């Protein structure tokens, strides 16, 4: 048996590349999730599955990313220095292609939609970027990009009630 949890870690800033890269705090985010995974102080999910209601993680209706980041008294925002959490997507059947989310830059009107067959989506707001040089030498300061990582839940092999990531001999990963 093999543990498989494929994802990607693409960063986006819908404003485009300028030096230094602007923040994504005014990007408007919608996420198709009623639940998220809180983490411990090492940013590993605790095993709890919490409702997004009345938390900074409630993106069920379009909301600026910066509104969540401004909730500096929320323990989950404090631990991650921003958003670095997995959202439990509203999926009716495992493997079904669903709308996971949408991100819009209100200034340029650029947007992206995310669709997936995975049960979760990790969202990371580049909380640890420190001005390193990225694509074309553009400086990437904190909050200069956002990543949308569709995947199974982090630490699934160690948390029995999370969806399985075990692939048995003869099974095909889809």
Where are these regions (language model features)?
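An exposed, glycine/acidic-rich loop-and-rim segment of catalytic or binding clefts
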Residues: 1-174
């Amino acid at each position: 048996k093999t543990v498989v949890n494929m994802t990607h870690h693409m960063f986006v800033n819908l404003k485009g590349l300028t030096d230094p890269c602007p923040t994504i705090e005014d990007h408007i985010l919608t996420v198709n999730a009623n639940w998220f995974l809180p983490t411990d102080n090492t940013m590993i999910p605790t095993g709890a599955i919490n409702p997004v209601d009345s938390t900074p993680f409630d993106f069920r209706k379009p909301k600026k990313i910066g509104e969540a980041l401004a909730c500096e008294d929320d323990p989950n925002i404090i631990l991650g220095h921003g958003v670095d959490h997995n959202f439990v997507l509203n999926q009716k059947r495992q493997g079904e292609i669903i709308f996971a989310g949408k991100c819009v830059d209100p200034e340029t009107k650029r947007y992206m939609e995310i669709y997936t067959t995975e049960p979760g989506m990790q969202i990371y707001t580049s909380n640890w970027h420190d001005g390193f040089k990225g694509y074309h030498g553009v400086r990437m300061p904190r909050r200069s990009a956002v990543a949308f990582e569709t995947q199974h839940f982090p630490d699934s092999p160690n948390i029995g009630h999370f969806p399985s990531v075990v692939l048995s001999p003869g099974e095909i990963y889809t």
